[in-house]
């Protein structure tokens, strides 16, 4: 047997084992990701079939302070639908895939214009009036920062 053939025989089982281990490490997430998202409102929005939340298909491109970002969501008309708002920290965290980084979204997600940035949530910090919660789509972690900073916001449809 050639050296190349022996190398391939060693690499293939290792690759298969790694793939299987990856799937088994996150079985609930891998199984639940199938059919998770549906395009709605003529493709302008995405329904998360796990949570029932409807998200903009393409998050806001504007970087703005917390208050104006929330106001912009409230005034939006996406796919002919009004009633948008800034998401809570808990709602925005539902989009995170803990196995992914940069961006921390599930593979095959239908969103566009996703940046591995920190996005505002509508959740203020209860201990500090000048601070609000955000979610990093690079790491998938929630963080806080001053409301005077500029970030993008990913609007969600009011239930």
Residue positions per predicted region:
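Glycine-aromatic-enriched surface loops/turns that form tight recognition elements
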Residues: 2-85, 89-159
């Amino acid at each position: 047997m050639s050296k190349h053939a022996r190398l391939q025989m060693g690499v293939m089982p290792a690759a298969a084992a790694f793939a299987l281990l990856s799937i088994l490490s996150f079985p609930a997430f891998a199984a639940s990701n199938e059919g998770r998202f549906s395009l709605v409102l003529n493709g302008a929005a995405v329904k998360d079939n796990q949570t029932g939340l409807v998200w903009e298909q393409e998050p806001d491109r504007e970087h703005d302070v917390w208050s104006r970002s929330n106001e912009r969501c409230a005034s939006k008309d996406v796919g002919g639908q009004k009633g948008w708002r800034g998401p809570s920290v808990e709602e925005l965290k539902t989009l995170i895939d803990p196995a992914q980084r940069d961006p921390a979204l599930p593979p095959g997600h239908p969103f566009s214009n996703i940046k591995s940035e920190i996005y505002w949530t509508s959740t203020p910090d209860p201990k500090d009036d000048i601070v609000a919660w955000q979610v990093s789509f690079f790491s998938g972690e929630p963080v806080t920062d001053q409301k005077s900073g500029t970030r993008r916001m990913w609007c969600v449809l009011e239930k």
